[in-house]
Every structure is written in structure tokens, then in C-alpha cells.
């Protein structure tokens, strides 16, 4: 019901957090989203979740660098999880903990990932435009 309602309000993408659902729930939500012509981001936090996410072949996969239990952030989480999902045909996103262009460059050089979810760093930046320019340049 929520997926259909979201679509009716103009939603074009949903987020499935693997850690918050069991396998059957994730499957059902994914199928329902595709029926409503919605894009799906499947978020993973560890290698086990990444293995589960591979079956969602039309999804974007987001690798969250924040440990949900400790709230610690490690960019190396993207590096290690990427090894599990590097065969995924869709886009892969590195999420959380990217504070500088050098952080993004580190991930890009290790994995080739050039999609990043960056929020806090942009909000706290004295010059978000300059930060965005630097981030965009790393993949060009």
C-alpha cells in the first residue's frame, strides 16, 4: 500500500535497507516497487547483506559506511563490501562518512565507484559549491 501511495505522490525511487527486513519482506517490497515503475536503492552494511542484495539485479546498491550498531564510520567498509558486489550490473553508491574530495578519491581509486551519498559534509561546509566541484572532478 505505501509503495502505491508513494508513487501516486510522485515518488520515483525507494530505499530498501536489508538490515531492517527479512528476505521475504525485501523481496516483496522490491517486486512491488518494480510493478509501480520505481527505482530501488538496496542499502547494505556488511558482506552478508551484500550477498543478499545481488539478487536485486535492477537495483542500485548502496554501501553504507556507518556501522548501525556502533555508529562508527569506516570508508574501508565500501572497499571490503565492493569485493562481494563488484559483478553487480547496476550502479553502486558509497554512503556516509565522505567528508572530503580525498575520501571520495580514495574510494574511487580502490573500487571505481563514482556515486556517493554525501549529506553532513555538504551541510557543514563553509563552501559547499567548492566541495561539490572537487568531488565531481575526481571521476573526470
Regions found by a protein language model. Name each.
Residues 3, 21-31, 45-47, 51-58, ...:
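Short loop-to-alpha-helix "cap/lid" segments that border enzyme active sites
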Residues 35-46:
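Active-site glycine- and acidic-residue-rich loops that bind
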Residues 75-84, 122-140:
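C-terminal helical cap(s) of enzyme catalytic domains, especially alpha/beta-barrels
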Residues 1-9, 46-57, 89, 94, ...:
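Catalytic cores of alpha/beta
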Residues 10-14, 32-37, 85-90, 111-114:
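Short, surface-exposed connector motifs at secondary-structure boundaries
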